[in-house]
Amino acid sequence: MYKRQKLGLDLKAIDMFEINEAFASQAFAVRRDLGLDPEKVNIYGGGISIGHPIGATGVILAVKVLYELQRTDKKDAMVSMCIGGGQGISMYFTKD
């Protein structure tokens, strides 16, 4: 079972997604396969737009999300991060 299911998260209800990608087709495929609203995905560009710096992309995308949550009325966001060798992890952020 996916952790989001354990947490009761509905992907359609999440306000923003930052999907890390080394290739543009990855972000497109994830958005398509999960049925995500394109207006909510990588709204300021994903990992490619910042040069996909190894070891830094995840934290850069997380900080982008945190600033966007602070700056707007969005209530939550999800960030995916690569951790090398084809592995991945995601973080869910919410504000009170």
Pin down the residues of each PLM region.
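Claisen-condensing/thiolase-fold acyl-transfer catalytic domains that form or cleave C-C bonds
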Residues: 3-96
